Amino acid sequence: MPLLERAVAAGRFPSLHRLPWRSDPLAACAYVAELLGDDNAVAQQLAVWVSDLRPRQKRKMLNRSVEKGTHYKWFLGGHRSDYAVWVHQYRPASVFVSSDRFAASIHNHRYPFVSRVLSGSLYISTFEVSSDEPRCSISLKGEQVLEVGDVMFLDSNDVHRIDRVLDDTTTIVVQGPPVRHYSTRFDPRNGCSERIYDLDALFPNLTAAFTKDGFIVG
């Protein structure tokens, strides 16, 4: 069944919650990769789905969407913390190439994910790293170009970088559940890495930002 086949008429994003996101997230992602790989109408179906959103659904989408330095993440749907579906709309090529953060950095993710190119192209490098400790070795593993219709499936430990994009590049992304509370960004210039923690991990230390010696700073 195409991923969006039942989503157009109902105005709801298709549910993928029956997949084994917790017990076998890689198998769940592999199944989604097959769905996306076989669905040549996904871009057109997605355009119809977005245009049919009711005001409340549109507001929910906007409230969950995120702006990054390299791209916009438009939230389409998901199920609790099992999976989430996004459209990544990349910034113009001239803007993207000036960034060395977010998608333009050498990094991995907290979760596995599957991505299909809806428009444009992405030029991607993959890397081998010795560890995600503060000091590590980083070496180029391979390079590839993803064009319209191509599907990419990455584990949470796969280290990669988007080197550049064409103008008007968009992808649909289905991400699985987080397998840890941080992703890692790597700097090839000095062999250093930096862990980027999620809000769940940072929350216990929140009060340290506005208290001192146990007293609230006024």
Name each region found by the language model.
Residues 166-184:
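A short hydrophobic beta-strand segment most commonly corresponding to one strand
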